[in-house]
UniProtKB/Swiss-Prot annotation:
Ranges annotated as spanning the membrane: none
Top-rank taxon, per record: Bacteria
Identification of the protein by name: Uncharacterized protein YqbF
Originating species: Bacillus subtilis (strain 168)
UniProt gene name: yqbF
UniProt cross-references to InterPro entries, sorted A to Z: Rho_N_sf, YqbF_dom_sf, YqbF_HeH, YqbF_N
Length: 103
């Protein structure tokens, strides 16, 4: 699993993903390699025996997250976080996407 965290600036958009300052996001290997020499990011690679399966969140886990974490997940799912008015809409969208990927 590869993660990237923006450490300079407020937001940074690359390859359709919007990063917000101080929020770590899981990124594909291609983006990880692209950002490798970028001083605006801290990158980490976690080695484990799991496949690159998408992470599944429960409703209670999502309710425990803050707005920035919801927005990060929504960006990774390919949507614009500003399309959602409140936490309930963000959580409903994320859960729907998780259900759709499981089918």
């Amino acid at each position: 699993m590869f993660t990237a965290k923006l450490i300079k600036g407020k937001t940074y958009n690359v390859m359709g993903i919007t990063f917000r300052a101080g929020v770590s996001q899981t990124v594909p290997k291609k983006l990880y390699e692209y950002l490798n020499e970028n001083p605006y990011f801290i990158l980490t690679q976690e080695l484990n025996n799991q496949k690159d399966d998408p992470i599944n969140y429960t409703e209670s886990e999502l309710k425990g997250m803050n707005k920035a974490e919801h927005e990060s997940i929504i960006s990774n799912l390919g949507r614009n976080p500003s399309d959602f008015k409140n936490a309930d809409e963000r959580i409903a969208y994320i859960l729907k996407q998780i259900d759709n990927k499981g089918e």
